[in-house]
Regions:
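Adenine nucleotide-associated cytosolic modules
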Residues: 1-175
Length: 175
């Protein structure tokens, strides 16, 4: 049986570990880097598999983390980018259909993991460009020695709250 619970609450470093503890698979559908790092770190610390995804305009990406089987989000991206280094979804815009495409791929990753079939995107970053209709599957190296959360000598032992700007309802508009 599958049970989906939703929560209308702010998630931060003080409550995320308790929130995810009882779940078999976590899906990251957040719209900002600090939240993505928070989810990654909590999932690594709690040994929880999860699917990361991100979209902006006509592009999307996703990867799946399974404890002990491949790199985590922080292995690949290290730290949140400096403020204003990357446009927010409010600034750049998000095409609603992209959420459907990438979200469906995340749902498929969860289903495959939960029923134990197929190949997951563990160790890979899948990118999609809707303008060219091209997918690319990029092999990711695992930074086992230097990753601050899943490496040989982790320095992050608890989730971290980073300053973040959340996109508003008007994020999909182009002015």
């Amino acid at each position: 049986d599958v049970q989906v619970n939703t929560y209308r609450m702010f998630v931060d470093a003080s409550n995320i570990r308790e929130l995810i503890r009882d779940y078999d698979f976590i899906i990251d559908g957040t719209d900002n880097f600090p939240a993505k790092f928070l989810i990654n770190d909590a999932c690594v610390l709690e040994q929880k598999p999860f699917s990361h995804a991100g979209i902006i305009r006509f592009k999307g990406q996703l990867m799946t983390y399974v404890p002990g089987e491949g790199p985590c989000y922080r292995c690949v991206f290290k730290n949140p980018p400096p403020k204003d280094a990357v446009p927010t979804c409010k600034q750049a815009g998000v095409i609603g259909a992209m959420g459907g495409v990438i979200g469906s791929l995340q749902a498929m990753e969860a289903i495959k993991y939960l029923i134990g079939v197929g190949e997951l995107l563990t160790g890979y970053l899948l990118t999609y460009d809707a303008l060219t209709m091209e997918f690319h599957k990029i092999k990711l190296p695992k930074d086992t020695h230097n990753c601050a959360v899943c490496g040989d000598h982790p320095t992050i032992l608890e989730p971290i709250d980073y300053e973040q700007e959340v996109c508003e309802e008007s994020a999909g508009r182009f002015d």
